[in-house]
Structures are given as structure tokens and as C-alpha cells.
Amino acid sequence: MPRSLKKGPFVDVKLMEKVKKALESGDKKPIKTWSRRSTIIPEFIGLTFAVHNGRKFIPVYVTENMIGHKLGEFAPTRTFKGHAGSEEKKKAKGK
């Protein structure tokens, strides 16, 4: 169930302060954040966020299409290495 419209989108207070500071100064450095749950709002367009994925910070450049999504959606937390299999199966699949 989506968030109520009367409440508005959730944005972490500390993150919003960092965004306002960056917009006032015109700074283009990535804004470091652990707040993956924050919703992307129109004020974020054109800014770069360094979103923490649990291990490192992933740079996310915000565009118009991202509005309404969460910052965490663009910084995957899991890596898929592939399933182990024998070489024979891989060769047979290729034929």
C-alpha cells in the first residue's frame, strides 16, 4: 500500500539539510547518505548522491525519471556471481 498523499513523500531531515546547502553553494560534490529510504523529490534533480549499499557508496545522479522512487533502488545491495556448474553443461548449452 502506498504512502498517504496527505503525508507527502518521506525525506530524511539531515539529507534535506545537505541538499539545501548544496543548492545554495552550487556545489557539485556527491552528497554522502545512508538514507536509502528517502524518496527522490524534484529538488534533487541534477544532484549526485553517494548512496551507501552496506559496503561502499554508489554514486547516483538524479534525473527527472527517478522522481517518486527511493534512493536505495539505485544502489543494489547484493551481487550475483552466478550458479556453479560443470564445464560440460556450459558447453552443451552453447551448441
Curated annotation (Swiss-Prot):
TM spans (from-to): none
Keywords: Ribonucleoprotein, Ribosomal protein, RNA-binding, rRNA-binding
A GO biological-process term: translation
GO CC list: cytoplasm; small ribosomal subunit
GO function term, MF aspect, one: structural constituent of ribosome
InterPro entries registered for this protein in UniProt: Ribosomal_uS19, Ribosomal_uS19_bac-type, Ribosomal_uS19_CS, Ribosomal_uS19_SF
PROSITE patterns in the record: RIBOSOMAL_S19 (PS00323)
Family of the protein in this entry: Belongs to the universal ribosomal protein uS19 family.
NCBIfam families linked: rpsS_bact
Task of the protein: Protein S19 forms a complex with S13 that binds strongly to the 16S ribosomal RNA.
Protein name: Small ribosomal subunit protein uS19
Organism from which the protein derives: Thermodesulfovibrio yellowstonii (strain ATCC 51303 / DSM 11347 / YP87)
Gene: rpsS
